[in-house]
Regions:
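Glycine-rich phosphate/pyrophosphate-binding loop shared by adenosine-nucleotide-utilizing enzymes
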Residues: 40-45, 56, 126
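Conserved catalytic-core motifs of GNAT/GCN5-like acyltransferases
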Residues: 110-125
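Conserved acetyl-CoA-binding loop-helix of GNAT-fold acetyltransferases
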Residues: 68-79, 98-106
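Short amphipathic alpha-helix that is part of the acyltransferase structural core
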Residues: 1-24
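Conserved beta-hairpin
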Residues: 30-44
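Conserved acetyl-CoA binding element of GNAT-fold acetyltransferases
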Residues: 53-64, 92
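Conserved beta-strand-loop-alpha-helix junction that forms the acyl-donor binding cleft
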Residues: 91-101, 118
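Conserved GNAT acetyl-CoA-binding A-motif
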Residues: 82-93
């Protein structure tokens, strides 16, 4: 059974899992997290970063998208909108990551545009699809 964990002692483990899968760069200290574990094995995670009082960036990575149960999605949005009092949540993914795009859109995010050459993989830069979810949506 997969359980969500927010223990501070797991923060770096969750970041190490999510960062390469979600193309996160530059998030090393000021972030919060939710880790999804099957026993002792991490199978997913959400990193929240760049909180400015109104907006927070959400970075999600899962070994299996079916692992994201509705109760976990609810926990993610409660954290963003009720704990942090955000007006919006922002997410990005590569245009060819269809599974991620479907998951983001099924959660209610709206596509807002394309950000050019923002995702770096090695020495290559890729475009990203920018998504936003407003509290009142």
């Amino acid at each position: 059974m997969i359980v969500a964990k927010t223990d501070k002692s797991l923060a770096q483990e969750v970041l190490k899992f999510v960062a390469p899968r979600a193309n996160i760069q530059g998030v090393h200290s000021d972030f919060t997290h939710i880790g999804y574990y099957d026993g002792d094995k991490i199978v997913g995670g959400t990193i929240f970063s760049h909180y400015d009082g109104f907006n927070i960036w959400m970075h999600l990575a899962l070994d299996n998208p079916r692992a994201m149960r509705r109760s976990y999605a609810k926990q993610v949005f409660e954290y963003c909108f009720y704990t942090c009092k955000c007006v919006r949540v922002t997410a990005m993914t590569k245009p060819n990551n269809i599974r991620c795009r479907k998951l983001i859109e099924s959660a209610g995010f709206k596509q807002e545009g394309i950000v050019r050459k923002v995702i770096r993989e090695g020495m290559k830069f890729h475009n990203a699809v920018l998504y936003g979810l407003l509290r009142n949506e």
